[in-house]
Amino acid sequence: KNESIGIKYWDTSGSNNWARPATLNTELNGAYLNNYATIAQNMIGNAKYYLGGYNGSNVTADTIYQYERKISGGGTYYYGTNPNSWVGKVALMYLSDYGYAASEECTKTLSNYNDLTCISNNWLFDKNYQWVLFQNPYRRYTVYRVVPDGNYGNLNVYENLYNVRPTLYLTSSVKI
């Protein structure tokens, strides 16, 4: 969704485990999804969402993508016993989605996306804080968000209300 459905906490109990489920997961796959007619709900398919994370900066969208899916060369991807994926209907955009949404002219690492070339040509850029589906693997209560200047950072899941832009996948039978 290219607009926020409002500002919300990622999780009110202080866990970065989306599959537990996190407060935001419960809301998106409950009240938010139930606002749509049954015919629309049936167009949304179950999808596998990857829950990997990273603790650091100066990385590209490609590197973030690999950590989300645990396909990079090594490192810590998840906090404790957090699962590496979750199957469901509605989640948040990946941090790599945000990185890939910038035009080819943006050659910066994601922590330097506050560059005008990166934000002016990124259709997912919004001048507001927005949650993404990306955890800090070293702290059970920390996830990432995109910040108003265009780059990203991590924050405790229960401290701030940020914008939520739901992500979903349509079933293969949907005709557009």
Model-identified regions with their sequence ranges:
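Collagenous Gly-X-Y triple-helix signature in extracellular proteins
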Residues: 1-176
